[in-house]
């Protein structure tokens, strides 16, 4: 059975950039390398992601804008000989250039300039995604100081980095064996939620030890993989419930710890009530959904 949802530019995820391990338990993000980040500088104005083939504005203009003005800015932009620029989607696009292996400034500044200025507004970049709550007037942004994905009032002013690339379609296939395949990324997902809420280390072990659909190479998804199944047009839960029925509108663990010099370990998790990426201590209890493939 096929479940197809159209989005403007679904693109394959790539590795998070996290190369450090924080605990002895196998299965955290750095234990798996998936599509290593790679970029090509086209000129002083643009850079192409070699994995997703999306072309990015290399240097933002260091100006903050409301969400509406951010969209107008991108659609009016002429850069690198192209005029089909737009505001990027949250999980499908802007999260793909977050480098979760870096401290504080989570973007590769070799390829993306203006990436070292500190300040509350500087690190927050608009996406085109609208929060699905009835009250609305809220849109998603990504914080490059933390890698978090949040929503805020569209009247706030934040930075903009425009993108260009083709439209694609997100498509899930129910394999009929309690698994779902994302035909765009090739990832195979556990269709249901595993058991009960667990601490992070226990969650890692559950996925590493899982045998499902005659396969035993399951793992806890990294934060970009987990983001690839978020549907920001939905709420409570923010996911395609036809493909993933009975998803709990709470947080699910990723395998990606927050890069830090602190002795305490915090980990990125995804709040499927609202579609947000947040972080919390590894000792918290969150839900678990395992994944395989993509390596």
Kindly label every feature range from the protein language model:
Residues 1-86, 90-219, 223-295:
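Glycine-aromatic-enriched surface loops/turns that form tight recognition elements
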């Amino acid at each position: 059975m096929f479940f197809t949802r159209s989005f403007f530019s679904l693109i394959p995820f790539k590795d998070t950039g996290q190369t450090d391990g924080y605990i002895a338990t196998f299965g955290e993000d750095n234990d798996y390398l998936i599509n290593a980040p790679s970029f090509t500088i086209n000129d002083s104005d643009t850079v192409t992601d070699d994995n997703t083939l999306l072309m990015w504005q290399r240097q933002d203009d260091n100006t903050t804008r409301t969400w509406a003005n951010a969209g107008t800015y991108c659609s009016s932009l002429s850069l690198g000989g192209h005029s089909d620029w737009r505001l990027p989607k949250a999980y499908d696009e802007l999260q793909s250039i977050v480098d979760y292996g870096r401290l504080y400034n989570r973007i590769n500044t070799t390829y993306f300039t203006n990436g070292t200025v500190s300040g509350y507004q500087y690190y927050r970049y608009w996406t085109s995604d609208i929060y699905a709550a009835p009250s609305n007037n809220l849109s998603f942004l990504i914080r490059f100081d933390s890698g978090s994905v949040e929503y805020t009032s569209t009247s706030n002013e934040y930075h903009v980095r425009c993108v260009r690339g083709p439209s694609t379609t997100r498509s899930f296939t129910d394999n009929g064996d309690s698994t779902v395949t994302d035909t765009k990324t090739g990832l195979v997902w556990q269709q249901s939620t595993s058991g009960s809420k667990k601490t992070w280390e226990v969650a890692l072990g559950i996925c590493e030890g899982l045998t499902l659909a005659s396969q035993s190479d399951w793992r806890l998804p990294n934060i970009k993989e987990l983001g690839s199944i978020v549907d920001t047009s939905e709420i409570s839960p923010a996911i395609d419930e036809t493909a993933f029925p009975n998803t709990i509108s709470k947080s699910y663990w990723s395998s990606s710890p927050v890069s830090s010099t602190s002795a305490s370990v915090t980990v990125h998790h995804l709040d499927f009530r609202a579609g947000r990426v947040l972080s919390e201590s590894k000792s918290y209890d969150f839900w678990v959904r395992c994944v395989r493939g993509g390596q």
